[in-house]
Amino acid sequence: MRHWRRKAMLATLPVIRDKSVRTPWREFWRRFLRQHVAVAAGLFVLLLIAIAFWAQYLMPYDAENYFDYDRLNEGPSSAHWLGVDSLGRDIFSRILMGTRISLAAGIFSVLVGMMIGTTLGLLAGYYEGWADRIIMRICDVLFAFPGILLAIAVVAIMGSGMANVVVAVAIFSIPAFARLVRGNTLVLKQLTYIESARSMGANDWTILFRHILPGSVSSIVVFFSMRIGMSIITAASLSFLGLGAQPPMPEWGAMLNEARSDMVIAPHVAIFPSLAIFLTVLAFNLLGDGLRDALDPKLKS
C-alpha cells in the first residue's frame, strides 16, 4: 500500500528533462540552417571545392591537349555536353579544370590579404599614434585606386601569370581587412576583460592575438567569404585582358578572351564560362550574407 501511494505521488510530479546546452557554435548553426538560400549557396560552394579537388577525374576529355577537329565551334551535344571551342577543345572539361584555377586564385589571394591586413589592423587599432597614422595613410593611398586598376598596375610591373595575379589581388585586399580589424580593435580594447588581462600582466601580443583577435573572427570570416567573389572577378578580368592566365590554361577569364572572335557564330563558347563566373560569385556573396546574419543577428533586425 505504501509503495502504491509513493508511485502515484511520483507520477503526478513534472518530469525534468535534460536540455542540451546552448553553445555559440550550436546557436550559429541553428540560425544559419534557417536561411535556405544561404544553405543552398554553401552547398554549391562545397560542390565547387569538390570539383576543384577532383577535376582531373571528372573531366571526360583532357582540358588542354584534346582537340576534336571535326567539331570546331559545335554546340552542346551528347559527346560534348557544353560544346567545343574554335580549336576543338571540350568546354565542359575546361570549365571543370578552370574551377580549380579560379577558386585557387580567389581564395589564396584573399587569404594572403587577410593575414597581412588583419595584422596591420590589430597594430593600428591597439597602439594608435604614429603606427595608426602610417598604416591608415598607406591604406588610404591604396583605396584611392580602383581595385582592378591597382591590380593591373601591379601585374604590369611584375609580369603576367597567375602567381602575380594572386599577389596583385592580395595587395588590394590588404587595406580592406586592415580597416575592418582596426575598427573592431578600437572597440574591443576598451572592454573590461581586456583591462583585466592587462592588469594580470598579459603582454601586448597575448592581448592582441588571444583576446582581441578572437573577438574579430566573425567579422573577418564574413568579409573573407564575400571578398572571394570580388577576387575571382578581378582575376578573371586580368586573364581576359591577357595579364593573368596564359593559353592554353583553362582559366575562365582566359576562356572568355579566346571566345571573343567567335561569339557571333558560336555564342556558347562565351556563355558557359560567363555563367560559371556568375554562379560562383553569386554563391559566395549569398553565403557571406548568410554567415553575417547567423553570426550577428542584430544586423539582420
From Swiss-Prot:
A cellular-component GO term for this protein: plasma membrane
Domain ABC transmembrane type-1: 99-288
Keyword Isomerase: no
Compartments in which it is found: Cell inner membrane
GO molecular function: dipeptide transmembrane transporter activity
Phosphoprotein listed as a keyword: no
Positions of transmembrane segments: 37-57, 103-123, 141-161, 162-182, 220-240, 264-284
Record's bilayer topology term: Multi-pass membrane protein
Domain of life of the organism encoding this protein: Bacteria
Listed InterPro entries: BP-dependent_transpt_permease (IPR050366), MetI-like (IPR000515), MetI-like_sf (IPR035906), OppC_N (IPR025966)
Function: Part of the ABC transporter complex GsiABCD involved in glutathione import. Probably responsible for the translocation of the substrate across the membrane.
Family listed: Belongs to the binding-protein-dependent transport system permease family.
Protein name (database record): Glutathione transport system permease protein GsiD
Lineage, uppermost ranks: Bacteria, Pseudomonadati, Pseudomonadota, Gammaproteobacteria, Enterobacterales
